[in-house]
Amino acid sequence: GLKLKISTVSFFQTNSYSAEVLYRTARDYVGDLGGSDKTVFDLYSGTGTIAQLMAPAAGKVIGVEIVEEAVEAAKKNAAANGLDNCEFIAGDVLKVLDEVEEKPDMIILDPPRDGIHPKALPKIIAYGVDHIVYISCKPTSLVRDLEVFLENGYRVDKAVAVDQFPWTANVETVVLLSWKSVDDFMYVDYA
């Protein structure tokens, strides 16, 4: 397991039992990235838990988080876990995506309740990665964002709801999005 240190201003899943299910599902969706040269973006990375779970399967993981204290905790956590292929950047995803030179092979999204900033969505989609894992804590913002992904060439392959807070209306959802291949379309020839 990972050693994790969190601060009072950092977000972290409070239900550790279902958080384990959530993180394991995300890790399973990522699967084998196919090599140590692959780069993963973990956008809205918090204290870096997901990034660190992905690190053994990737050449590099870049986490982006707006809360500076969470980024500092992520850096310390990666060091404590002996992970030297994790980089964490403090900043707004919308702005940081314009500054990062690396291009991802896969993207993991775990945005706040309001979902992804509408101006960040086109930037994320423009990378054209084959797979995106989207973790959402609010179904309405998830649906809104998924519509944009679907309109731009992605499809939902898998989705799992994780009940983080039993007896409440809150649910976390883990979605695997995949780029539609040519095989996903039906062509009709009119003679």
Predicted stretch roles:
Residues 1-191:
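Rossmann-like S-adenosyl-L-methionine
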